[in-house]
Structures are given as structure tokens and as C-alpha cells.
Amino acid sequence: MSTQQTAVRAIIFDLGNVLLPFDHGKMTQQLAAVLQADPSELATFLFGPDEWFLKLENGDFPLDEAHRRLCERFADCSLDAFANAGGDIFVYDEPMHRLTRTLKELGLRLVLLSNTSALHIDYVRRTYNTLEPFDELTLSYQVQASKPDSAIYRHAIGQAGCEATECLFIDDRADNIAGAEAVGLRSHLFRGIGELLPWLRSQGVAV
């Protein structure tokens, strides 16, 4: 006897390397240029044992304070130069944007769930139309929790306005998929739109 699959009412998407490919190496090089810093020294500062960049994404300090701290550590630059150098790390993905628009037209609720900072989400907002189809944004620096912490998934489910079993979750990291499945989300490890579309259809989404 087959069991009936719960109908999908909402889809929760990751941002980086799902909706928009990105490159932290590009960010490091560009920030190094405006801060007059050695790229390897800056990379260690951002991503080394102190986890400075993870703290920024987790909302431990705001963007203007991040700018001040980096200028104190390296060299002065304007906030605009800092924001552009740090934010310009994405590549626009038109097929994924078309997909999210289609899903929205199907009547599904769309939620973005991203470990991100104001540095990156503000750049995406002012540069691309990627976020237009989304009903809600669950952003780590605002929630002050990051994937795979269960708290941020539960926040996104709340924004979806339905049960976890009625949501799908899409992310490019296996640890984030495991965290999502632990709270009851049907999840897909993203490896490109070519694998995503058949999975969505297998979940009853007519794309």
C-alpha cells in the first residue's frame, strides 16, 4: 500500500551557490585592494581561527562596525568602497531566477534561508532581481543563528506559515541538509538545476 505524499505549500532556498554562485576568494582579493592588505593575511583574519567572518554572518556586530574594525586593522577606506569590494562576489543565474518565478506563479510560498551578512544581502538587493519572488527572508545576521543550528530552520518554517512536512528545503551543503532533515524538512542537496527539477517533480511540484 502506498502512502500519500504531503502536498508542498512552501519552498525554502539557500542563496549562495544555489540561487547565485559566489566566490569568497574574489571578496578577499577585492577587500585586500581597498584595505591595502596582503590577501593571505586578510584571508587569515577573515576566515581563520577567530572566525571573524562567521561572526559577521551570525550578527555578532553590524556592518559599520565591521568596516571600522577592518580599517583599524589594515588601512582606511570608505564604507561604500568596502561594501562594493566585499559584496561583489556573485554571478547572476537567470535559469534559477526563472524557476523561482515559476514556483511563485504556482502559488507556492518562497522563503530564503541564508547564512549571510548585510554586506552581501544588501549588494544582492541593489544589483539583482533574485529576491523579488520571495515572500520572506530568514537571514542569519538578523536571526543571530546560522545553519545548521535548528533555531534558524524553525524560524524559516515559521515564516513559511505551514508545517515542516509541507516545506521543501534546497541547499548546497551536506551539513545544512542534515540540519534541515533533523527538523523534518524534505531536503535536496543542490548540484545544479538539472538535478533539482526532477527532484521537485518527485515531490509533486509541477515544474
What residue spans do the PLM features occupy?
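Asp-based, Mg2+/Mn2+-dependent phosphohydrolase catalytic module
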Residues: 2-9, 13, 117-207
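N-terminal helical cap/lid subdomain that shapes the substrate entry/recognition surface
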Residues: 4-98, 105, 117
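Generic structural signal for small/hydrophobic residues in well-ordered secondary structure
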Residues: 14-17, 59, 103, 112, ...
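Alpha-helical elements of Rossmann-like donor-binding domains used by nucleotide-donor carbohydrate transfer enzymes
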Residues: 26-30, 51, 65, 69, ...
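Proline-centered loop/turn at the N-terminus of a beta-strand
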Residues: 109-111, 186
